[in-house]
From Swiss-Prot:
Cited HAMAP family: Ribosomal_uL6_B (MF_01365_B)
GO aspect biological process, one term: cytoplasmic translation
NCBIfam families xrefs: L6_bact
Gene behind the chain: rplF
Subunit (UniProt): Part of the 50S ribosomal subunit.
Cellular component aspect of the GO annotation: cytosolic large ribosomal subunit
Pfam families: Ribosomal_L6
Molecular-function GO terms, alphabetical: rRNA binding; structural constituent of ribosome
Role summary: This protein binds to the 23S rRNA, and is important in its secondary structure. It is located near the subunit interface in the base of the L7/L12 stalk, and near the tRNA binding site of the peptidyltransferase center.
Protein name in the entry: Large ribosomal subunit protein uL6
């Protein structure tokens, strides 16, 4: 039995679940998410919890057991609490601002980088150097934050660039010069 897969998923009262034709739909106060569940895994939905069970003991069923439980748990948590990812911008003249449905980044290039904010995600900018990506779909929030970071990843010598708030940058020493 999978250590993660055997844990039940608690459901709050304001979450509505629908499971038919191997598609799970979860609706809550923040939004609605749907996901196809693998056929080797089955869901048992009660009033207060979801239990993920596998249909057989094959290798795919065992590996999908814990994965499916985590994905369903992320769906339930997303529509109730939501997810967020924080980014920091370091560098002289590096800044960000939200204009309508676009995030405009000044990252030391000759032109500003314009990023269109995807549907289902909100972006807040605090003090021009802190960007917070929020949403109810964990996968979309992480993907959006990774795209913003990829415009100027932090470099190891001065640490300039866009980094996650909880990320540590391994710093390198510069050239020592000729002796």
């Amino acid at each position: 039995m999978s250590r993660i897969g055997k844990l039940p998923i608690d459901i709050s009262k304001d979450v509505k679940l629908a499971f038919s034709d191997s598609i799970l739909s979860v609706q809550g106060p923040l939004g609605k998410l749907s996901r196809r569940i693998m056929p080797c895994v089955n869901l048992e939905i009660t009033d207060s919890c979801i239990i993920v069970m596998r249909n057989d003991e094959s290798g795919t069923a065992r590996s999908a057991h814990g994965l499916t439980r985590t994905l369903v748990s992320n769906m339930v948590n997303g529509v109730t609490k939501g997810f967020q990812k924080s980014l920091e911008i370091n560098g002289v003249g590096y800044r960000a601002e939200v204009k309508g449905s676009e995030l405009v980044l000044s990252l030391g290039y000759s032109h500003p980088v314009v990023f269109t904010i995807p549907a289902g995600v909100t972006i807040e900018v605090d003090k021009l150097t802190k960007v917070v990506v929020k949403g109810f779909d964990k996968e979309l929030v992480g993907e959006t934050a990774a795209k913003i970071r990829s415009f100027r990843p932090p470099e190891p010598y001065k640490g300039k660039g866009v980094k996650y708030a909880d990320e540590t940058i391994l710093r390198k020493a510069g050239k020592t010069g000729k002796k």
